[in-house]
Every structure is written in structure tokens, then in C-alpha cells.
Amino acid sequence: KRNARNRDNHKPYMTLGHYWKFSEKLNIQSNFYAIVGKTSNTNLNWFGANDPRPDYYKYLPSYFISDQGTLTGNQTITEQSDYQQILDGWQSNDPNTTQLNWDLMYQGNYNNLYTQNNIGNTQSSLTGKRSKYIVEEYRLDPRHYGFNSFGKLNINEYSDLNFGLNASIYKSKNYRKMNDLLGGDFWVDIDPFALRDFNDPSLAQNDLQNINNIVREEDIFGYNYDIHVNKNELFGTYSYNKNRIESFFGINTSTTTFWRNGK
């Protein structure tokens, strides 16, 4: 058995704490943390081939039911034999109807001998088994480091001062990589939807600096960028409580900077 969609989430969390009792009136607690790992999601993709998903709307019994008569309940079946065959397959839980046909995808890739010209803005070409079906992987690899410190000062029996700071640095690598060519030799990095809508190969290129980019297993393609987020915060509160008089004063200042570094 095999799944087209797999999720792998592995992000270990490390913390280091320190408690400092400076005096009877002043205590400070500090913490450092780090998160390093990855989140991975796989998915099927295809080009120049039929949709392999068994629940694609054209493969369901409802596709063969006419919209006419919907309000009156007098709908008609356009293709009785196809409708009945698919309906029987779903009702009997036939794996040929309800599951992905991996053998068919492998066979389609094996038989697709193709010559790709004009690779990387050059006159070079490549002949091999061009994959029609692939398993691609969407990755988010975070690196998150932070520090915070909190203190409490007992000024006297009526008043206290609380203060602290937070600082964090976050960077995540976001990219798509080739997980499995399903028996093929390479994949060409173009957008099939743009090619369909505009019928212009130049508008379908995902990488304008590398026309007709050839992708092999474990290669990064489609998109590749880093997200950076840096945060800093300072705060303090003063409280006073005596008899029937109670007061509170607080101040907070913070900065957040973020940017995207595309590749």
C-alpha cells in the first residue's frame, strides 16, 4: 500500500532556563529556546496526462447525471453503461475504482520517451523518459531561536516593579522538491495551467532564469525562498496598593521586522 499524501512533522523543541535570586527583593528568571526541524507534505502532480485521482469529478457517478430536472427530481443519466459501471465500483469498494492506480502511472512514465530542447537558455537537449506523473514534496524547514527574561522587584511593602524582555529570530526555508519521478528520468519545470490558459511556453516557465529546467529526484524546483521574522520587546509594570488606594502603570515597546528572500 502507498499514499500520495504523506505529512512528516519533526520539530524538536529545546529549552534552557535559569532562575536568579539576586536578593530577597529581586528575582530574575531567564529562558532560551530553540526549534529546529522540518514540515513535509507530499502530493501527486502530473503533466500531459489524465487526472489520476479516483475522486476526480469526471470519475464519479454524479458526472453522468444531467443537471436538467434537478429542481423537479427528474434528472436523467447521460451514459447509462458508464454510470452503472462506476457506481458498482464505488458501492463494492473496488480498488480499481476507489484507489490510485500506481502501476498505470509508472507505465505511463516508462513509455514516455521524450526529447526536451532548449534547456537552460541554451541549445542543449535531453532525451529520456519524461515523467507524466510525479510525487512532489512541499517543505518548510524552520529555525527559531528566542530569549526571554522576567524580573520582579519588591520596592517596599506597598509597591512592586515587574519588567522583562523578549527577543526571537525566526527563519524558515520554503521550497518544493522532487520526491519521486515514479520510474521516469526527469521532469520539466513548467506550469501546466499557464500553458493551458495562454498556449505560450514562455509564460509557463516557473524559472525564468533557467528555461525548461530539468528536474531530477531530490532537486528543488517551482519555488525556493526564505522567510525572516525578528521580534524584540521590552515591558515594565509598576503597581501600588495601600489601604484603599490601588494604582497600576505599564509600558511596552516592541519591534517586528520581516522580509522574504527569494531565490
Residue ranges, per PLM feature:
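Signature of Gram-negative outer-membrane beta-barrel scaffolds
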Residues: 134, 159-263
